[in-house]
Design a protein with these regions (language model features):
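Hydrophobic side chains within alpha-helical segments
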Residues: 36, 46-49, 74, 122, ...
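Hydrophobic transmembrane alpha-helices
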Residues: 2-51, 55, 59-63
Length: 174
């Protein structure tokens, strides 16, 4: 066992393993989103956020906000970065609250509803930037994209939530 010499904190294998796992998962989330970028408003991030919340509980913040940091580093500061600071947390809390649910249809509905409400969740930042009129007009004009987001999230979660949950649960127990 490493001795604490005062200038460093020894980490056991579990801590190093968690740091590595969360780094890989955050980077994978970023890469998977951009691998699917050719499909408008269809992304796996919502699925990953739900999975991280269910598998890792409070520690889900690490891969989720690593993903947000990668967005910021690669694409610069934009309003979406501000929104991402709380939007993914909303979904993570909802998923954590539903963690006992086994039915993939339930997870698909949660993910689909999140996609449908994505524009509404963005509205507080839009109100701060341009006022209520701006936020409402932006939300309404984005409804077709939110519908696409809803459908994509629903299908992705319905097909992939159960097998990926089993995989992450297994990784978390090792």
């Amino acid at each position: 066992m490493a001795r604490n010499t005062g200038w460093c904190i020894p980490l056991d294998k579990l801590k190093i393993r968690e740091i590595t796992l969360f780094a890989v998962l955050g980077a994978m989330t970023f890469a998977a989103k951009y691998a699917m970028a050719f499909l408008p408003n269809i992304e796996p991030v919502s699925l990953f956020v739900m999975l991280f919340a269910v598998a890792f509980g409070k520690k889900a913040v690490y891969p989720i906000y690593l993903y947000v940091l990668l967005e910021l580093l690669f694409f610069g500061l934009g309003t979406w970065n501000i929104m991402y600071l709380y939007i993914w947390g909303i979904l993570a809390l909802a998923a954590y609250g539903c963690r006992g649910m086994e039915n993939p249809l339930g997870w698909a509905i949660l993910s689909g509803c999140f996609g449908l409400l994505f524009g509404a969740f963005c509205a507080p930042v839009d109100v701060a930037i341009g006022g209520v009129g701006y936020a409402v007009s932006k939300w309404i004009s984005g409804i077709p994209f939110d519908i696409t987001h809803c459908a994509g999230n629903f299908v992705i979660a319905f097909v992939l939530f159960r097998p990926m949950r089993q995989m992450l649960t297994k990784l978390n127990k090792q």
